[in-house]
Design a protein with these regions (language model features):
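Single-pass alpha-helical membrane anchors
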Residues: 126-143
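Cell wall/extracellular polymer interaction/catalysis modules
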Residues: 1-117, 123
């Protein structure tokens, strides 16, 4: 199973808003604490019991870090490095709402236990800007 966390924008309150996809299908919105966010890259995932939340969570195997897992929250201050996942997002406020971490764990549970889940974390491509740059380069080099 493949997850992809696409980071869309940084917020005035110190967060990074994004979108989470599971096997190419939109799952929910994400929010990370910009100061403690996971580096971009490809990571394996596993099931981990969280004493803090008294439940199993979908955890991310980040080298040099422990207890990085998807959980609920609304603001960047609700995370010390973990991605928060939710149903809705308020881009102006830099917040999310409607915890989906339990739903995510249940969806991934069997694959997490079998070691068959990976996540790619990256910045989303800004297509309008990218196309403008490519267009300018083509114009410049074909004159």
């Amino acid at each position: 199973m493949n997850l992809e966390l696409l980071r869309d924008s940084e917020t005035a309150n110190g967060g990074i808003l994004g979108r989470l996809y599971v096997d190419g299908q939109f799952f929910g919105y994400t929010l990370e604490n910009a100061a403690a966010a996971i580096p971009a890259g490809l990571f394996s995932m596993f099931a981990r019991f969280s004493p803090k939340f008294n439940s199993f969570k979908a955890a991310i195997d980040v080298p040099g870090r422990e207890y990085i897992m998807f959980h609920g929250g609304n603001t960047p201050g609700d995370s010390a490095g973990c991605p928060l996942v939710a149903k809705s997002m308020d881009a102006d406020a830099g917040t999310i709402a409607g915890d989906l971490s339990g739903v995510l764990y249940e969806r991934l549970k069997n694959d997490l236990e079998a070691g068959n889940v990976v996540i790619t974390i990256r910045r989303a491509t800004n297509w309008p800007v990218l196309l403008a740059i490519v267009g300018a380069a083509v114009y410049f080099f074909t004159r």
